[in-house]
């Protein structure tokens, strides 16, 4: 689901060799800070921002030949802090002062700045959370990533409205602290070692998690004992990638065992959007998924000016903001009519998030002169809703995520009736719907370990990494564990096999799409990411482990 390549906008593969400052950057506030190199030093000047000024400008990700680049090349790509002068200025700005920095129309206050461009260090999204009462320096006194909080509920510290202005924007540096245990044993050689724990190695952790998943429904006492041991071995989300990933799966199983659901406080949306944007800047996963999906859509929309997208995976709408901009660039000679129908499950989607996404997409569309009609419907109505046949002059596209496999049979029957122009499906690499719950957990643990390894390789700002894990990856793991453990009758087959069984045929990605994806990965500052082709899917992998894949489908001709 996704965010922008904010630094470069080219026109096709031929432009990859000339990523220059001539390409405009999407604005986020009335004034943007630009840096000029003079005499080996950097100097800042303020220049008026270009139109449009939508808060979704920074959500625009590369989707076609005219917008492909990498957000890793900029100063903010890895969450680095600004210069000392900027830091001092930022430290004095509270959330209450944000309203004075931007226009007040269309709710461009706190959330507007959160979605804004991150080229100005004083407005960098990672810094929004630096001094939040929810996080303290003492939480990060151990090496590794993650918040040292065994409860780990998103509502652990509810922030009262009276303290909102205390959330200061700054660029404080996170200090790495040496493990106290290492210091202690380094100077006291005769101190007896701690009691030996039960096989704390990778194999032991994985086996215990798999066993807990096997017996969590049939033998709760045994599952509780296994998780109690894991609580001692994995007391906090710090350490190596496997240990951090295992911690989150252990927490998800604990919540499942005790029937605990996470309650979001009113400020969780701010934290989640900030983590989402940081993840897009640090990792190519989101850009790859959005770019590849949108390129397939654009190729299928050729010759149409009335477009209808049925979306089962809306996220924050960044994919569609990018697509709208691409449509304007390609078809500026003819008026465009775009309709987006969102199907969302009330159990898995927050109404505040959906409303935020809906309003901002409308605002963005109005600024680039696209006629947009967007509506949100409950997924529960899918089986009873009557859908009119589409016109021959209208292109219908469907966006699906493999993560919604529990609803996939119902969704595909509905989609088959629509007979869309194209269907795009994204797969996060952690979904193995043909496996039983315990084996699915082991596969997902391996996939998330690879994701953490890829994030560690970037060597990004520690605080940004902690926010990504807590507000983006941990909720994803909890949802995955909860959804797969529910007693729903589901066919034991892959989602690809279900597509074929329901009467859909795969569509091969164009050579242009593959070349653009390769160029995207090559712009990533670390080595280890690579693109693979598997059947009709285009995959982004880390060290041969799939992180995300995108495939395109059509209704099979009868």
Swiss-Prot record:
The keyword Magnesium does not apply. It is found in: Nucleus. Residues 482-554 are annotated as: SAW. Expressed in seedlings, roots, leaves, flowers and siliques. A motif (VHIID) lies at residues 307-311. Pfam families: GRAS. Residues 356-388 are annotated as: Leucine repeat II (LRII). GO terms for molecular function: DNA-binding transcription factor activity. Residues 196-554 form the GRAS domain. InterPro entries: TF_GRAS. Residues 396-479 are annotated as: PFYRE. GO terms for biological process: cell differentiation; cell division; circadian rhythm; regulation of DNA-templated transcription; root hair cell tip growth. PROSITE patterns: GRAS (PS50985). Residues 19-90 are annotated as: Disordered. Keywords: Nucleus, Transcription, Transcription regulation. GO terms for cellular component: nucleus. It comes from the Eukaryota. Residues 276-340 are annotated as: VHIID. Residues 54-75 have a biased composition (Low complexity). Residues 203-257 are annotated as: Leucine repeat I (LRI). Belongs to the GRAS family. Probable transcription factor involved in plant development. Interacts with Meloidogyne incognita 16D10. This is Scarecrow-like protein 6. It comes from Arabidopsis thaliana (Mouse-ear cress).
């Amino acid at each position: 689901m996704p965010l922008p390549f904010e630094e470069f906008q080219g026109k096709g593969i031929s432009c990859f060799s000339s990523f220059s400052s001539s390409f405009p950057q999407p604005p986020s506030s009335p004034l943007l800070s630009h840096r000029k190199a003079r005499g080996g030093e950097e100097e800042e000047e303020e220049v008026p921002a270009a139109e449009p000024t939508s808060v979704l400008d920074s959500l625009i990700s590369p989707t076609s030949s005219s917008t492909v680049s990498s957000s890793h090349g900029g100063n903010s790509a890895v969450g680095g802090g600004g210069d000392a002068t900027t830091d001092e200025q930022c430290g004095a700005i509270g959330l209450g002062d944000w309203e004075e920095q931007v226009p007040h129309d269309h709710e461009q206050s706190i959330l507007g700045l959160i979605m804004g461009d991150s080229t100005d260090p004083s407005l960098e999204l990672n810094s929004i959370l630096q001094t939040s009462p929810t996080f303290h320096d003492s939480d990060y006194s151990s090496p590794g990533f993650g918040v040292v909080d065994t409860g780990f509920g998103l509502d652990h510290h509810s922030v009262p409205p009276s303290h909102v202005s205390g959330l200061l924007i700054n660029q404080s540096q996170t200090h790495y602290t040496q493990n106290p245990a290492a210091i202690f044993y380094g100077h006291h050689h005769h101190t007896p070692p701690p009691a030996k724990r039960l096989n704390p190695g990778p194999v032991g952790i994985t086996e215990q998690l798999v066993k807990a998943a096997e017996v969590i429904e049939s033998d709760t006492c045994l599952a509780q004992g296994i998780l109690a041991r894991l609580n001692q071995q994995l007391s906090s989300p710090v350490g190596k990638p496997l240990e951090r990933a295992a911690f989150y799966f252990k927490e998800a199983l604990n919540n499942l065992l005790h029937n605990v659901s996470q309650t979001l406080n009113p400020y969780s949306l701010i934290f989640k959007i900030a983590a989402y944007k940081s993840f897009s800047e640090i990792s190519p996963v989101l850009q790859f998924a959005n770019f590849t999906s949108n390129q397939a859509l654009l190729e299928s929309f050729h010759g149409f000016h009335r477009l209808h997208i049925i979306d089962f995976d809306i996220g924050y709408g960044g994919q569609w903001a990018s697509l709208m901009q691409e449509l304007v660039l390609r078809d500026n000679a003819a008026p465009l009519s775009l309709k987006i129908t969102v199907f969302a499950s009330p159990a898995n989607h927050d109404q505040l998030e959906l409303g935020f996404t809906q309003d901002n997409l409308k605002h963005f569309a109005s600024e680039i002169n696209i006629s947009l009609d967007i509506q949100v419907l409950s997924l529960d109505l899918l089986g009873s809703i009557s859908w009119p046949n589409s016109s021959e002059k209208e292109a219908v596209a469907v966006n699906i995520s493999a993560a919604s496999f529990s609803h996939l049979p119902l969704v595909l029957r509905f989609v088959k009736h629509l007979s869309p122009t194209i269907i795009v499906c994204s797969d996060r690499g952690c979904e193995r719907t043909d496996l039983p719950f315990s084996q699915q957990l082991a596969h997902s643990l391996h996939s998330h370990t690879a994701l953490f390894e890829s994030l560690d390789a970037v060597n990004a700002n520690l605080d940004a990494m902690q926010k990504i894990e807590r507000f983006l990856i941990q909720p994803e793991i909890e949802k995955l564990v909860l959804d797969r453990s529910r007693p729903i009758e589901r066919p034991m087959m892959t989602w690809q096999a279900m597509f074929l069984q329901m009467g859909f045929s795969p569509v091969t990605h164009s050579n242009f799409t593959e070349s653009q994806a390769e160029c995207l990965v090559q712009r990533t500052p670390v080595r280890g990411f690579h693109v693979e082709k598997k059947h009709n899917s285009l995959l982004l992998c880390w060290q041969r482990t799939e992180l995300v894949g995108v495939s395109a489908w059509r209704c099979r001709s009868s």
